[in-house]
Amino acid sequence: MVIPTLKGIRITIRPLHQADIDKRLRWKPYPNPLYKHYNRGEMSVEEKDKWYEDRTTNPNMLYLAIDNNQGELLGFLNIFDIDPENRKASFGIYLGYEYTNKGYGTEAINILIHYYFEKMKFRELYLGVAALNHRAIHCYQKCGFEYVGTTYNKHDPRSDLDIFGDERFIDIRKYFKQEGDNILVRFEEMKITKEMWLTSKDNLCE
């Protein structure tokens, strides 16, 4: 698969470099305890090598880095579960904490969607987002994604948060449920098709 370099107004989406893991490790941590699983501690050389290899050798995955015009690493885009026969895939995006709420994610998604439909010639793009992540959901809706369903996934096993006992989380407990020893979190499934994008692309991601 050809790995693209895509330029926008404020960002460049490019192939992943092995040095990107060290850049990521220098990001400021997410202060919200619900997102602390995004924060990475120190990694050994072997762990860094595996991180890079896992993301660059999988034929069903296209893992890309996002830079700003100053060359700072802002985050990553990932197209995965690539199904060439049915012309569909899923995607995810992750930004460093200090680069959120600045419009970078919206611009990156806009660029990705254009490349995905016009250059890759795919027809459907899917994503899953935690239902409590209202900021991300709003961004995806701006970019033309629509709800298609709801599912529950295991809460990150690295988390030691007491969702049902800690009063800090009383307002978001509705997004979680307990099944045996597992805590599950609600995810919204969303998608955009090429037809949806062509119909409304002039009004999206502004």
Predicted regions mapped to residue ranges:
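Conserved acetyl-CoA-binding loop of GNAT-fold acetyltransferases
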Residues: Q141-T151
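Long, contiguous binding/interaction regions
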Residues: L112, K119, S159, F187, ...
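Conserved GNAT acetyl-CoA-binding A-motif
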Residues: E118-G128
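Conserved acetyl-CoA-binding loop-helix of GNAT-fold acetyltransferases
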Residues: N101-Y116, H134-K142
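Mixed-charge, low-complexity intrinsically disordered segments
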Residues: H155-E179
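A short, well-structured alpha-helix characteristic of acyl/acetyltransferase catalytic modules
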Residues: M1-E42, E46, I183-E206
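Conserved beta-strand-loop-alpha-helix junction that forms the acyl-donor binding cleft
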Residues: L127-I137, N153-I163
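Acetyl-CoA-dependent GNAT
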Residues: G41-T100, I183-L184, K191-W197, K201-E206
